[in-house]
From Swiss-Prot:
Disulphide bridges: none
HAMAP family, alphabetized: KdpA
Keywords: Cell inner membrane, Cell membrane, Ion transport, Membrane, Potassium, Potassium transport, Transmembrane, Transmembrane helix, Transport
Protein name: Potassium-transporting ATPase potassium-binding subunit
GO cellular component terms given for this protein: plasma membrane
Organism, as annotated: Leptospira interrogans serogroup Icterohaemorrhagiae serovar copenhageni (strain Fiocruz L1-130)
Amino acid sequence: MVTEWIQLLIFLFALLIFSPLFGLGLYKVYLYKTSGFEKFLYKICGIDPNRNMDWKEYALSLLVFNFFGFLLLFLILFFQNYLPLNPENFPGLVWDLAFNTAVSFTTNTNWQAYSGESTLSFFSQMAGLTTQNFLSATTGLCVLLALSRGISVNYNVFALGNFWKDMIRGTLYVLLPLSFIFALFLVGFGVVQTFSESVSAITLEGNTQIIPLGPVASQVAIKQLGTNGGGYFGVNASHPFENPSPISNFLQMFSILILPGACVFLYGRITGSIRHAWAIFSVMFTILCVGILIVWTFESSWNPISGTLGFWEGKEIRFGILNSSIWEVATTVASNGSVNSMHDSFSPIGGLVGILNIQLGEIVFGGVGAGMYGMILFVLLTVFLSGIMVGRSPEYLGKKIEKREIQMSILGILLPSTIILLFTAISVSVSDALSSLTNRGPHGLSEILYAFSSGAGNNGSAFAGLNANTTYYNVMIAIAMILGRFGVILPVLVIAGSLAQKKRSEIVSEGSFSTEGGTFYILLLSVIIIVGALTFFPVLTIGPILEHFIMFQNLTF
């Protein structure tokens, strides 16, 4: 137990120390002078890096870029059997699975209704999925940059930056070098990286077993750093070829949260309010710590079904309950979705924490860039409510918060929640959806709820007892992923454009609500819990909460 506490504290302190340092590094990346290679890229792509955009042009560029990324990935997957680097001669994916997978990786969700080692070729994994892991992560970073600039400028609707320049710099100077270095570390610790074909082995029982290989480390590096999460293997980071040792496990857990944590301080530096960034980071850090402690406690508690201490089903013995608990909370507070244990086998309350983390809107660290701009929607709502309470016009970092900003904030917060509840309600009423369940009762409801929470929240993890590789779920979850991603991005860019055209007052007026102290911390935390968590309380009571109490009657589903 002492060793586990030491490991947990090392993990949390590492996150606390390195997040502001990485944030400073990100900030400096976007201050660099244009390099020769960068100029060459701009020239061959026909990009004018000095041309700034308003929010409409920025949004249009982002949507067009992501659409063509989706289209290219769909074609790669659909025509996989005609493309190179397919030593196992895998066929092309059927249209609905190709559609779902292309949407999934384009939206940074990485929901996987297939098992990678038995479905996708090396080319599809590398040129298709890994490429989108880079581009989808940088897309989130671009949106955060646009919002940060919109808040920090005065009367300049064309000060949101250049989407193409932001995309190239984020990929070239942030994700590529970090992923390359991290992949080398992973290879050193035993993660597979090869183009060799699958190996046949004779087991101790005398049976033949096929051991799949592939370029795993290069995909694992960006899937964690980019908060993507999609695994090369079906069981993700539970597989010893993806995550062979406690050291690789620790590094991957840390890499899930480091860039989302750094984005908080990138935002603080661009807007000129580091103390405000620390206040936001404190809220995120608090929710993370509480989540880990709750999951660890319940996963280590008495299991009335097996009559033993601890919920060990679905967990890797080599990692133990603590590492499984940390990973579950880290991967669900971030829009990562990778797993080193099976969430479907967690205790009801342990699973509840994972679902709720996603349903909050992936704002506690969240995705690269995406978590921070999602959190700002809650910050604006908090500032607005506090302004109403004290009877003053709400201000945020020197700018007036008015009707348009609040409308867009509420839209960005409520749209994913509406999608989750609506699509879950439809699915429990449709026979095609119910036929995919392998568990009934409250746990079956939790599996469907988790699937649409994961899709709309762009997380990608799952309660794997649900057979999601059907036309119904492939299409419905893909729609949820699209709306959950771009239904938040567009309101954020509208807010950025609206704030950019306003004057920023450097003088804090008397009676203005401070966004740096303990009062702001408490109010923001309260708004997240009330608006985010209570939205889902009714459905959670008939899902994991009900399952928790039924479990003590020795009933399972």
